[in-house]
Amino acid sequence: MDGYARVGKLEKDLELGNGETLYPGLSYGENQLRWGFIRKVYGILAAQIVLTTVVSSVTVLYAPVNDLLRGNSGLLLFLMFLPLLLLWPLHIYQQKHPLNFVFLGLFTLSLSLTVGVSCANTDGRIVLEALILTSSVVCALTGYTFWASKKGKDFSYLGPILFTGLIVLIMTSFMQVGLFNRMYNMPTTPLACFHKLIQIFFVMTMQMMFPVGPTSVAIYGGIAAIIFSGYIVYDTENLIKRFTYDEYIWASVTLYLDILNLFLTILRMLRQGDN
């Protein structure tokens, strides 16, 4: 009887993967499928990060590219808003191969160019420090989220909190750049209005990337770093528990944006501290 009990316990352990599942209640088969999905997402994410590193390096090291982007405010503004435009077809065609990878590549490329411009205007030592700090934070938060999910912890409650914080962050950027005063003093002719709107959005975008004042940068950067760190935990848990197996593109996009925003926030804070 004791032998039968041991065999039964062994079969149960095999079915549950010796208890080493991603989160409690997940069967052994689902656990294997989920791990395959996670590896696929992180593979795509790694490719995005490599592409961003290469494109940013070219932008920094190849002077004509950097001069072209810095000297053409219209082109830089277009590249800043292009990722927002690409998010719509990327979401629509996320499950249609090869269009999903085409739009993902364009999305990553457009963001990489703007990151390159930010890095080109920053001392190399600061860029390296920001890269090391971001990598450390991402690895620590990712490891913690996997461990916490295995212990049965749930971070779904963070979604509304982080979204509210992000909205407050964006509205703060608008107020810093004086958007509402600029809109109130709009000219009357259509052409002048159009030019004014272009100026507003350009200044607004630059202010969101480079807020003015050391106190403003410290407060803004600290809150932004907390929010994007929270999003890494929240989206990593979504990767573990909630994303379907067909949403590998969208899962990689969310994590990529979390990491990129955290890097730019740390870069901004270190640059201001160095100044």
Where in this protein do the model-derived segments appear?
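A hydrophobic alpha-helical transmembrane-helix feature that marks the membrane cores
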Residues: 1-275
